[in-house]
Amino acid sequence: SCPNPYLRVFPIKEVADIGRPKGIPLIIDNTASPVICKPLAHGAAIVMHSLTKYIGGHGTSIGGIVVDGGNFDWTKNRKRQPLLNEPDQSYGGAVWIDAVPQLTGANIPFVIRLRVVLLRDTGAPLAPFNAWQIIQGLETVGLRMKQHCSNAEKVVTFLETQKKVQNVIYPTNHQGEIKERALKYMKGG
């Protein structure tokens, strides 16, 4: 949503609107802006976060999260998602796009397949103690993100007055369309 190093906010809705009719889900890495940016509300189908950064807030545990918004029609173009739309022999020939809604009542075949197949194949589930540590940070992520943004704005204001500083990169310091996207997508900080 807000990639390094130039902090040019990604055009979430615009890209999602191009892909959806073609059966292409928009997957966003929102590690840099949890709470501030809500990609699912703007048309993203899947959102990822590194839990180690802002969400955990302390760097004691390595982890990640994938959120399936349940808002994407995985049947729109079945050929684009063969892993979801063709029989999975490792699960008795289950077709994820058909089985998941029947079992869960939700349109989340991507994240269910990710959870059961990828975790089975890689053995990468989060340990209970690490989950507990991340939850400790999650409790205050909203407050911390607000303070991070407030502090960043103060640093930007200070740096802009320094003669030895040639350029300050900050999402709302850009001009035109890039600034408009920052104001549109980055709220809550």
Where are these regions (language model features)?
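Conserved PLP-enzyme active-site core in the AAT-like
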Residues: 1-161, 169
